[in-house]
C-alpha cells in the first residue's frame, strides 16, 4: 500500500454495516430487462477489460439472462496491457502473443536473442511481463507464502469505503479495502461481487512460463451477491496490487456483460401461408403453425407399420414421450406437474443446433420416402449448422454455413435431429438436389409444442382465487430440453444402464413425434387435389377438435386454450380430469379446515354474502335508532317541557303586572 503510517495486515477488516449497505444499493438498481420472457436465450459474452476499458479476455455462450456465471480465467499480464510501465506491456495490444525472448543466459556468456535477466531479482520496478523469465518470477511472487496479491472493489463499494481512494491508488489507498485475493492474511468479504485466486499452481505455471506463454492465469468467480446484481452490462471495476516489499505495484481491471439477441424466430418450409399468419405487430414474431394432426396412429418402436390408432392414443403417446424425456433430464420438475397440448398452432418447434452429420455415397435407410415430411416448421430458434445457399432472411439461424462439394452423396442428420429445409423436414439431404435447386437446410432438434405448468398455477386457475397482474410465462419442452440432443441424450450418456435408459426414453419421444407427423403427412397427401396451402392450414387447425374430444372424454383438463395432463413420478395420469377434481377437492378441504366458522359460513353460502351486504346498512341504522332513540326522545321532551314552562311563567308574570297597575290607579283615586 502507499500509506506509510499503516502496517500490512494479517486479516481483512470488514465493516459490519457492509452487507446492509450493499443490499440497499442493489435494491435501488433497475435491472436490465430484455424481452418479456425470462427464459429467452441470448448470446452472452463476459468480457474482462484492462484499465483503458479494452477487452483483453472474453468467453461467449447462449443462455437465458442472469443464469450463466462461468469462471473467468484471464492472465494477470493481460490485465496489465497498456498499464503502468513497471509491467512492461504499456505498448502491447490486446490479444497479442506474449513478448519474448523465450530463453535466457547468465551474466557471463550471452546468447543472441536471449534475455539476460534470468538471475536478476524481481524488484518493485522490474518489468514483470515483458519476458518469459520475468513472468516466471511474477508467478513465484503470486504463489509465495509471504507474497501474493490482493484486490479492492471500485465504485460499486459501499459508502463507508470512500477512504479506499480511486483509480490512482487502484482503489486500495488504505488497509481494509481489500475484499479478495491470494495473500497470507486471506482477504475476504461478505458483500463483494467476485473472488480472485490463482488458476495454476506454481509447479504448473513453471513449464508454461518457460514455453513463452501467458502463465499467470487467474480464476475469477462470481459470489452470491455478484449473481444477484443485474448491472453487469455497464460493468464493474477493481484494483489489483501485488504484495511485495516496498511499493505495491498495481493495475485496474473490469468485468462487463455483453448481451446480444440470439435472433428472431424464423419459419422454414414450403408453405408461405403459414409464415404470414403471425401478427406483424408483435415485437417477437408469434408462432405460426407447423404440423398437426387429423388421422391417428399408435407409437410402437419396433413395428415398421404400426396399426392405425385413435386420436387418444396418438396424442397421449406424444405427451408420454415428452414426460419421459423431461423426467430423465429434470426429475425435480416431474414430481408433480401438468403437461399441456396447445389447441392453436404451432404444434412443433425447432431448435437449431451444431452437429456432425454423416456422409454417405448411397442413400441410408433413414432416407426412405416414409420419413420425409413436406411440412412447414414455422418456428426455429437458436443458431446451428446450415447447408446450401441460405438467404439473408434466414442467415440469423446459422452459426456455421457449409458449402457442398462436387459429387452425389447424402448427408444424414445425427440421431435425434433432422434437417429443416425450404422444401420440408427430412432426416437426410441429397447434395445433387441442393446443386440443382436453391434449397437450403438447417440442422434442428424437433420438439412437440408441449407446455409445462406447475400444479399451483393450474389449481389457482380453476379456483379463481389468484389474480395475476401479468400472465406467467409458459415453459415449453423446447425451452426445457432444447440442445440436449447434441449434449448426449441421443448418443447415450457414458456407458451402461444410464445410457440405455436415456436412449430408449428419448427414442420413445422421437417415435411418437414421427407417428404424429406421419399421420399429418398422410392427410395432406389425401388433400393434395385442393389448394396445398389452404389444406395444410385447415388440417393443422383440426388439432383443436382432437383436443376437444380428449376433454369431453375426461382424459385432459381444459385450461384456457390448452389440454392438460397430470403427471408425477409414477407417470402420466390417464384420467386427468378426475385427478384435477380430486386435487381441487383436497385443496378445498384443506382451505376450509384452516378457516374459522365465520369465514366458512360465507364461503359455503355465496348468496349469504350478498344478502348481508344488502341489509347491513338498514340494520345498523335501525340498531342505532333503538339504542339512542329513547335517550334523544327524552331529551327532546324535556327540552319542550322546559320551553313550555318558561312561556307559562312569562304569561303569569305579564298578568301579575297588569293587576298591580289597576290596583295602583284605584288607590290614587
From Swiss-Prot:
Annotated stretches, region: Immunosuppression: 539-555
Region listing for Receptor-binding domain (RBD), in residue ranges: 32-267
Record-level Gene Ontology MF annotations: metal ion binding
InterPro entries linked: FMuLV_rcpt-bd (IPR008981), TLV/ENV_coat_polyprotein (IPR018154)
Binding-site positions, Zn(2+): 117
Coiled coil: 502-538
Keywords assigned by UniProt, alphabetized: Cleavage on pair of basic residues, Coiled coil, Disulfide bond, Fusion of virus membrane with host cell membrane, Fusion of virus membrane with host membrane, Glycoprotein, Host cell membrane, Host membrane, Host-virus interaction, Lipoprotein, Membrane, Metal-binding, Palmitate, Signal, Transmembrane, Transmembrane helix, Viral attachment to host cell, Viral envelope protein, Viral penetration into host cytoplasm, Virion, Virus entry into host cell, Zinc
Transmembrane intervals: 612-632
GO terms under biological process: fusion of virus membrane with host plasma membrane; symbiont entry into host cell; virion attachment to host cell
Side Extracellular, residues: 32-611
Post-translational modification summary for this protein: Specific enzymatic cleavages in vivo yield mature proteins. Envelope glycoproteins are synthesized as an inactive precursor that is N-glycosylated and processed likely by host cell furin or by a furin-like protease in the Golgi to yield the mature SU and TM proteins. The cleavage site between SU and TM requires the minimal sequence [KR]-X-[KR]-R. The R-peptide is released from the C-terminus of the cytoplasmic tail of the TM protein upon particle formation as a result of proteolytic cleavage by the viral protease. Cleavage of this peptide is required for TM to become fusogenic. The CXXC motif is highly conserved across a broad range of retroviral envelope proteins. It is thought to participate in the formation of a labile disulfide bond possibly with the CX6CC motif present in the transmembrane protein. Isomerization of the intersubunit disulfide bond to an SU intrachain disulfide bond is thought to occur upon receptor recognition in order to allow membrane fusion.
Residues in compartment: Cytoplasmic: 633-669
Location of the region described as Fusion peptide in the Swiss-Prot/TrEMBL record: 473-493
Glycan attachment sites: 43, 199, 293, 327, 359, 366, 399
Site (Cleavage): 470-471, 650-651
Pfam families: TLV_coat
Chain span(s) of sequence motif CXXC: 337-340
Lipidation (S-palmitoyl cysteine): 631
Protein name stated in the entry: Envelope glycoprotein
Organism per entry: AKV murine leukemia virus
Species classification: Viruses, Riboviria, Pararnavirae, Artverviricota, Revtraviricetes
Amino acid at each position: 500500500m502507499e500509506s506509510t503510517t499503516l502496517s500490512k495486515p494479517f486479516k481483512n477488516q470488514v465493516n459490519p454495516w457492509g452487507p446492509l449497505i450493499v443490499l440497499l444499493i442493489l435494491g435501488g438498481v433497475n435491472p436490465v430487462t430484455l424481452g418479456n420472457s425470462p427464459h429467452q436465450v441470448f448470446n452472452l459474452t463476459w468480457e474482462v477489460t484492462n484499465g483503458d476499458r479494452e477487452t483483453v479476455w472474453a468467453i461467449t455462450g447462449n443462455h437465458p439472462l442472469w443464469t450463466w456465471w462461468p469462471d473467468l480465467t484471464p492472465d494477470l499480464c493481460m490485465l496489465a496491457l497498456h498499464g503502468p510501465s513497471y509491467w512492461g506491456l504499456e505498448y502491447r495490444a490486446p490479444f497479442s502473443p506474449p513478448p519474448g525472448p523465450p530463453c535466457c543466459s547468465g551474466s557471463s556468456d550471452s546468447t543472441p536473442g536471449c534475455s539476460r535477466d534470468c538471475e536478476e531479482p524481481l524488484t518493485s520496478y522490474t518489468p514483470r511481463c515483458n519476458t518469459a523469465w520475468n513472468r516466471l518470477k511474477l508467478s513465484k511472487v503470486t504463489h509465495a507464502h509471504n507474497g501474493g496479491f490482493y484486490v479492492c472493489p471500485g465504485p460499486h463499494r459501499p459508502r463507508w469505503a470512500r477512504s479506499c481512494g480511486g483509480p490512482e491508488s487502484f482503489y486500495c489507498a488504505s488497509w481494509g479495502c481489500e475484499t479478495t485475493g491470494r495473500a497470507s492474511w486471506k482477504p475476504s468479504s461478505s458483500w463483494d461481487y467476485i473472488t480472485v485466486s490463482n488458476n495454476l499452481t506454481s509447479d504448473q505455471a513453471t513449464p508454461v512460463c518457460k514455453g513463452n506463454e501467458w502463465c499467470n492465469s487467474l480464476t475469477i468467480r462470481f459470489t452470491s451477491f455478484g449473481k444477484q446484481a443485474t448491472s453487469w452490462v455497464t460493468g464493474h471495476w477493481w484494483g489489483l496490487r501485488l504484495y511485495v516489499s516496498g511499493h505495491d505495484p498495481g493495475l485496474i481491471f473490469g468485468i462487463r456483460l455483453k448481451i446480444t439477441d440470439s435472433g428472431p424466430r424464423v419459419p422454414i418450409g414450403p408453405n408461405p401461408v403459414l409464415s404470414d399468419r403471425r401478427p406483424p405487430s408483435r415485437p417477437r414474431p408469434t408462432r405460426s403453425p407447423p404440423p398437426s394432426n387429423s388421422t391417428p396412429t399408435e407409437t410402437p418402436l419396433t413395428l415398421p407399420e404400426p396399426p392405425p390408432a385413435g386420436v387418444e392414443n396418438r396424442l397421449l403417446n406424444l405427451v408420454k414421450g415428452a414426460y419421459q424425456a423431461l423426467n430423465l433430464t429434470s426429475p425435480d420438475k416431474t414430481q408433480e406437474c401438468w403437461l399441456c397440448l396447445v389447441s392453436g398452432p404451432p404444434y412443433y418447434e425447432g431448435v437449431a443446433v451444431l452437429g456432425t452429420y454423416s456422409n454417405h455415397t448411397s442413400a441410408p435407410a433413414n432416407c426412405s420416402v416414409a420419413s420425409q415430411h413436406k411440412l412447414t416448421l414455422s418456428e426455429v430458434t437458436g443458431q446451428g449448422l446450415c447447408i446450401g445457399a441460405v438467404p439473408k432472411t434466414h442467415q440469423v439461424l446459422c452459426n456455421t454455413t457449409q458449402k457442398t462439394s462436387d459429387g452425389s452423396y447424402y448427408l444424414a442428420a445425427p440421431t435425434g435431429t433432422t434437417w429443416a429445409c425450404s422444401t420440408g423436414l427430412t432426416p437426410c439431404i441429397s447434395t445433387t438436389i441442393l446443386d440443382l435447386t436453391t434449397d437450403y437446410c438447417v440442422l434442428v432438434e424437433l420438439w412437440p409444442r408441449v407446455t409445462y405448468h406447475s400444479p399451483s398455477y393450474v389449481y389457482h386457475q380453476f379456483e379463481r382465487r389468484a389474480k395475476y397482474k401479468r400472465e406467467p410465462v409458459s415453459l415449453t419442452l423446447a425451452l426445457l430440453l432444447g440442445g440436449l440432443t447434441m449434449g448426449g441424450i441421443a448418443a447415450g450418456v457414458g456407458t451402461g444402464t444410464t445410457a440405455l435408459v436415456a436412449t430408449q426414453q428419448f427414442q420413445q419421444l422421437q417415435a411418437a413425434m414421427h407417428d404424429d407427423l406421419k399421420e399429418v403427412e398422410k392427410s395432406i397427401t389425401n388433400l393434395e387435389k385442393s389448394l396445398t396451402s389452404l389444406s395444410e392450414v385447415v388440417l393443422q387447425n383440426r388439432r383443436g377438435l382432437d383436443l376437444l374430444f380428449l376433454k369431453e372424454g375426461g382424459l385432459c383438463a381444459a385450461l384456457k386454450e390448452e389440454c392438460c395432463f397430470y403427471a408425477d413420478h409414477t407417470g402420466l395420469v390417464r384420467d386427468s380430469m378426475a385427478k384435477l377434481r380430486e386435487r381441487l377437492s383436497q385443496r378445498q378441504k384443506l382451505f376450509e379446515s384452516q378457516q374459522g366458522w365465520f369465514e366458512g359460513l360465507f364461503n359455503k353460502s355465496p348468496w349469504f354474502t350478498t344478502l348481508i351486504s344488502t341489509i347491513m346498512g338498514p340494520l345498523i341504522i335501525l340498531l342505532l335508532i333503538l339504542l339512542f332513540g329513547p335517550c334523544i326522545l327524552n331529551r327532546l321532551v324535556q327540552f319542550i317541557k322546559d320551553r313550555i314552562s318558561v312561556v307559562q311563567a312569562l304569561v303569569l308574570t305579564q298578568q301579575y303586572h297588569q293587576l298591580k297597575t289597576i290596583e295602583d290607579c284605584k288607590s290614587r283615586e
